[in-house]
Amino acid sequence: MRTPTCLCLLLICMLISCTPTQEKHEIDYTSYVNPFIGTDFTGNTYPGAQAPFGMVQLSPDNGLPGWDRISGYFYPDSTIAGFSHTHLSGTGAGDLYDISFMPVTLPYKEAKAPLGIHSKFSHDDESAYAGYYQVRLTDYNINVELTATERCGIQRYTFPEAQSAIFLNLKKAMNWDFTNDSHIEVIDSVTIQGYRFSNGWARDQHIYFRTRFSKPFEKIELDTMAIVKENKRIGTATIARFDFNTQEGEQILVSTAISGVSMEGAAKNLQAEVPENNFDKYLAATKANWNRQLGKIEVKSDNEDDKVNFYTAIYHSMIAPTIYSDVDGAYYGPDKKVHQADGWVNYSTFSLWDTYRAAHPLFTYTEPERVNDMVKSFIAFYEQNGRLPVWNFYGSETDMMIGYHAVPVIADAYLKGIGDFDAEKALAACVATANLDNYRGIGLYKKLGYIPYNVTDSYNAENWSLSKTLEYAFDDYCIAEMAQKMGKKDIADEFYKRSQNYKNVYNPATSFMQPRDDKGVFIKDFKADDYTPHICESNGWQYFWSVQHDVDGLVNLVGGKNRFAEKLDSMFTYHPSEDDELPLFSTGMIGQYAHGNEPSHHVIYLFNSIGFNDRTQYYVAKVMNELYKNEPAGLCGNEDCGQMSAWYVFSAMGFYPVNPVSGRYEIGTPLFPEIKLHLANGKTFTVLAPNVNLSLIHISEPTRRSYI
């Protein structure tokens, strides 16, 4: 590696008050948001309208299933078959697409299922920014505009002169989603309400809605059909058609509130958030809301693409988790009962295996009040379900992925002194979840100090034994840190001991973490670059480094700093062969490093721990400049509910939380000459790197340490 030329980096923390420019939003940050980033390749994002952390994600659906269309939208497609109110951002499993509307002129185009009623469209007639989406439906010459409040979606259709109709399809389902039952009832000539119940990734999902049209419909047709499963009727599939006679340029607004609780809850949400037919008013309010959020981090740069990538990353990091309680505080719990969040907001859509790494640590600085409510949501979930969430949304635990990663989110919040959540209840929930002997090998983990690959339980069908051992060890460390701070020495000692279990799957003969059976024998014919059922979405190279809580211990385990440096270098230089068939999640590859999936995200920063800071800086800059682009295919892997973007936000600011609960941030290399992080307590953290550019990425020491 060449001898680095160094730039000067200054880290400044100063106390200031909120400035007038922050309140006036003289900079329109939404203009730097490109919601189409991630809608191509493997990003799995959607371009539609949403308020920050909003319950409603109002976005177009292409109408076709498939892994590329998990978000409902895939940039290479050329059809739109509806605009639905719920979506998942960047996940690897598909669900939701609830309450789907489609405007048409008569006669309309209908294809065989699954596409159904649809229209062609062109990207030349499509635009979007934070809180807004627009497209012209080519086949009907209808212009569609979308915006959203937290719990409501507002659509504005501009029609030609024609006999027109608006379809509401509660039968439509894609990917893992399946309609169980649905219902529509007419309140008056402009108001309807109903529900859609479904099964899929989210089990027994309930979505209720209330919709108001700005113009009375002339006629309504209901198409209902029985839903039959195993020769038994389980519900009704409903499609409604609302007819209108429209003039050239006439606009009809469709305002819809949703609720997980009841039609009455949806009606309250609509009345509270969208009481009138005024698209521009609510668009302006949501745009202002996004500007407040995006303006929490200011950057100065002459590179427009870098600013778009950065503010789009902040935007994507604030898509999830999502608000789940109604305006009156009611929400539907995992116990299938209605509960009340009094004085706080209940949140859902927690992709914790992904987001505990960077997204939630970022929230502790940009969203401390929401973090408090998220922890309260975890505690409530535990009280209603008997364990903390793993991957939950819309009142359902999916049990997707591994670990008990609500724990680091809770511990980080507690150790930073955030909020007024009940720490005693929170710690009790963490300890109880970590001691569920019949859940995903935890009992064997406690008994043997690792999870054997040859023993399964009812929750362990996917195996992933090696990865679970490493993830549990990290989560146990987080419990220990929280207990230690609370003065609970017995709990702390127990879980500090458990946090060392990562050493039990290290094989000195191969110098890799390696699966073991219940007799303690390491699996035979182990190849670190193989993708096997024992390692979660990764290979032995990628998961080896998942010891974020004890990097010094890992260094010693492999034989010291020199050996560690050799192994870490090999991670980035041992490239897959051209004949290797890599799985979907192995993308953004640099050697064996896979930036497209989360287990690799902290690895670049491990060079700091052995004094090779320049290598951290080199690879951080390489990833930021080569794997994040201002284009639809601009993400190299699943967005994963904000984690992919949160990595970029932290790294662009010049630091990253390798161990998310340590309060320690490894210094990388900033992307911008000046960055200001405005904190909720009125302080501003400023990073200055006045000479930074693509060829000048290495920094002189800002402190005597490689971290802050």
Report the location of each language-model feature:
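Sec-dependent N-terminal signal peptides
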Residues: 6-10
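Positively charged n-region of N-terminal signal peptides that target proteins for export
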Residues: 1-5
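Single conserved hydrophobic/aromatic residue that forms the stacking wall/gate
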Residues: 697-701, 705-708
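Accessory carbohydrate-recognition regions in carbohydrate-active enzymes
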Residues: 23-360, 364-408, 414-470, 478-504, ...
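C-terminal motif of bacterial Sec signal peptides marking the signal peptidase cleavage site
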Residues: 15-17
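ATP-dependent phospho-/nucleotidyl transfer catalytic cores
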Residues: 475
